[in-house]
UniProtKB/Swiss-Prot annotation:
Residues 1-25 are annotated as: Disordered. The keyword Chaperone does not apply. It comes from the Eukaryota. InterPro entries: Ribosomal_eS32. Component of the small ribosomal subunit. GO terms for molecular function: structural constituent of ribosome. It comes from Eremothecium gossypii (strain ATCC 10895 / CBS 109.51 / FGSC 9923 / NRRL Y-1056) (Yeast). Belongs to the eukaryotic ribosomal protein eS32 family. This is Small ribosomal subunit protein eS32. The keyword Ribosomal protein applies. It holds the Pfam family Ribosomal_L41. The lineage of its organism: Eukaryota, Fungi, Dikarya, Ascomycota, Saccharomycotina.
C-alpha cells in the first residue's frame, strides 16, 4: 500500500527534478 502511493509521488518528483537539473546545468 505504501509503495503504491509512493510510486505515484516519485513519478511526479522525477518530472520536477528533471526541470531543476536542467536549470542547475
Amino acid at each position: 500500500m505504501r509503495a503504491k502511493w509512493r510510486k505515484k509521488r516519485v513519478r511526479r518528483l522525477k518530472r520536477k527534478r528533471r526541470k531543476v537539473r536542467a536549470r542547475s546545468k
